[in-house]
Regions:
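A conserved beta-turn-beta hairpin within the catalytic core of GNAT-like acetyltransferases
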Residues: 85-87, 96-107, 117, 164-165
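Conserved GNAT acetyl-CoA-binding A-motif
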Residues: 134-144
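Active-site acidic-Proline motif in GNAT/NAT acetyltransferases
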Residues: 113-115, 119, 147-148
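A short helix-loop-beta-strand connector motif used in the catalytic cores of GNAT acetyltransferases and
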Residues: 43-74, 106
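Conserved beta-strand in the GNAT
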Residues: 72-74, 84-93, 106, 111
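A short beta-loop-alpha structural element at the N-terminal edge
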Residues: 9-21
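Conserved active-site alpha-helix within GNAT-family acetyltransferase domains
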Residues: 123, 127, 135, 147-166, ...
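Conserved GNAT-fold acetyl-CoA-binding loop/helix
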Residues: 22-58
Length: 186
C-alpha cells in the first residue's frame, strides 16, 4: 500500500482493457468473499461496455437508444517492471430518479489493486464520475458497500458520502425470480 500520490492517467476503458478489467473484477469478488459468483466472460463484458452480441442470454449489449449498457473508466498505472498496466477501474451505469426527473450514476464496481491503495486512484475515479455528473446535469452518484468493509466505509466518509441507513436492498434471483415471473400476466 502506498500513500504517495501517483500519476496514473484516467480514461474511458477500451475493448483492449477487458482482460485486465475482468481480472480485477475477479480480484474484487475474491476480496468480497464471492468469487464463486463470478460468471461473466470477456465476451459478455465487452458487450456490456461496447455493444455487440454476447453469447449468453441476459446481457443487454446496448440500451434501447443504442448506448452501451454500462461504462468503465480505468487508471493507467506506470509500472517499471511491467510497463503501463491498469491500476484501478470504475464500472458504472445510468440510473434514474423519478423525484428529480434526472439521471444519476450508479457505481457498480470500484477497485484499486491492493498494492496501489492509498495512491489516490479511487478518489480520482470518483472525482471523474462526479465531474461527469456535474457536466451532464445528473443529480446523484451512488453505490453500495458491504457493511464489513471498514476501509471502504472510512474512505467514502472522507468524500462526504453518507450511508442511506433508512433503505434496505432487496434482490430476487434464481428459482424465486422464475416463480415471480410465472405469476406475471403476459
Amino acid at each position: 500500500m502506498t500513500s504517495e500520490p501517483t500519476t496514473g492517467r484516467i480514461r474511458p476503458a477500451t475493448p483492449d482493457d477487458v482482460p485486465e478489467i475482468l481480472a480485477m473484477i475477479r480480484d474484487l469478488a475474491e476480496y468480497e468473499r464471492s468469487l464463486h459468483e463470478v460468471e461473466i466472460t470477456d465476451r459478455q463484458l465487452t458487450a456490456l461496455l461496447f455493444g455487440g452480441t454476447p453469447e449468453a442470454p441476459g446481457v443487454a449489449a446496448t440500451t434501447p437508444n443504442g448506448a452501451p449498457a454500462a461504462y468503465a473508466h480505468v487508471v493507467e498505472h506506470p509500472d517499471a517492471e511491467r510497463g503501463t498496466r491498469l491500476g484501478a477501474f470504475a464500472l458504472w451505469f445510468l440510473n434514474t430518479s423519478t423525484w428529480t426527473g434526472t439521471h444519476g450514476v450508479y457505481l457498480e464496481d470500484l477497485y484499486v489493486r491492493p498494492e496501489l491503495r492509498g495512491s489516490g486512484y479511487g478518489k480520482r475515479l470518483l472525482q471523474a464520475l462526479a465531474r461527469l455528473c456535474q457536466e451532464r446535469g445528473y443529480r446523484r452518484l451512488e453505490w453500495w458497500v458491504l457493511d464489513w468493509n471498514e476501509p471502504a466505509l472510512g474512505f467514502y466518509r472522507t468524500l462526504g458520502a453518507l450511508p442511506m441507513d433508512e433503505w434496505t436492498v432487496h434482490r430476487v434471483t434464481g428459482d424465486d425470480l422464475a416463480a415471480l415471473a410465472a405469476g406475471a400476466e403476459g
